[in-house]
Amino acid sequence: MLTIADHQFSSRLLTGTGKFSNHNTMLQAIASSGSQLVTLAMKRIDLTRGHDNLLGPLQSMGVKLLPNTAGARNAKEAIFAAELAYEMLGTKWIKLEIHPDPKYLMPDPIETLIAAQHLCEKGYIVMPYVHADPVLCRRLEEVGCAAVMPLGSPIGSNQGLATETFLSIIIEQANIPVIVDAGIGAPSQACRAMEMGAAAVLVNTAIASSANPQQMAKCFADAVATGRQAYLAGLGAVNNHAHATSPLTGFLSEPSISSLAKSVNSKGG
């Protein structure tokens, strides 16, 4: 089970709600993924009409919603978005995202740490999206974050685990769940993240942009489960040189060769 704060999840695949062609496709994909923790941007929620045509169906599915602060450019804006999420949705769970650069959407480490400390002190369950920076992730754990969400590669890029070396260090050092977020573009990449020991992965673009989001979501679910089982089973060591799987000595010793030669000669005679 994946444990975040006081909540347990049987699925280790988190999904997002953006970039789908329509709401029905999104809902079908989320259902197919088996995801129990779904992110959504606060800026996409519209309650002015009495109900929201995105929020309602998600709530009816029984998934836990993880509002995010996407669009925030600094700590002040992110804190405001988190407080708004609490007022609108009644949850103190928040995926903290602060990326002032609209081109590459790189998270701002300084503003993220400032906002995380403030929100943790206010009792929020903070899950920050950050660079794959082991030092920063340690600091975020120290201020009380419930999990850290280091990127594999830029958001929406489908480039995979470009930061694998640093992700490994973060996973090794962390005492809270490490959820690989951003850039995962194929089920094999999600599987690899889980094999490394990640607690979970978050996938959005790779599912939403595929030709068949519902089927792709199921593929990711299977890959995440397989990767987790492989991690628990214990992967074999990686070596720089060959190791024979069968003995290379003994059967070619002089007595063996002599016996073989006699056998061949007797049959030939």
Swiss-Prot record:
Any GO BP: thiamine diphosphate biosynthetic process
One GO location term (cellular component): cytoplasm
Protein's UniProt keywords contain tRNA processing: no
Highest taxon of the lineage: Bacteria
Reaction equations catalysed: [ThiS sulfur-carrier protein]-C-terminal-Gly-aminoethanethioate + 2-iminoacetate + 1-deoxy-D-xylulose 5-phosphate = [ThiS sulfur-carrier protein]-C-terminal Gly-Gly + 2-[(2R,5Z)-2-carboxy-4-methylthiazol-5(2H)-ylidene]ethyl phosphate + 2 H2O + H(+)
Record has Chloroplast as a keyword: no
Residues the entry annotates as binding 1-deoxy-D-xylulose 5-phosphate: G156, A182, G183, N204, T205
EC top class named in words: transferase
Residues annotated as the enzyme's active site: K95 (schiff-base intermediate with dxp)
The protein's Enzyme Commission number: 2.8.1.10
Pfam families assigned to the protein according to its UniProt record, in alphabetical order: ThiG
A Gene Ontology molecular function term of the record: thiazole synthase activity
Pathway noted in the entry: Cofactor biosynthesis; thiamine diphosphate biosynthesis
Keywords assigned by UniProt, alphabetized: Cytoplasm, Schiff base, Thiamine biosynthesis, Transferase
Localization, UniProt: Cytoplasm
PANTHER family named among the record's database cross-references: THIAZOLE SYNTHASE
Job of this protein: Catalyzes the rearrangement of 1-deoxy-D-xylulose 5-phosphate (DXP) to produce the thiazole phosphate moiety of thiamine. Sulfur is provided by the thiocarboxylate moiety of the carrier protein ThiS. In vitro, sulfur can be provided by H(2)S.
Similarity comment: family membership: Belongs to the ThiG family.
Record note on quaternary structure: Homotetramer. Forms heterodimers with either ThiH or ThiS.
Protein name per its UniProtKB record: Thiazole synthase
Originating organism: Shewanella frigidimarina (strain NCIMB 400)
Classification of source organism: Bacteria, Pseudomonadati, Pseudomonadota, Gammaproteobacteria, Alteromonadales
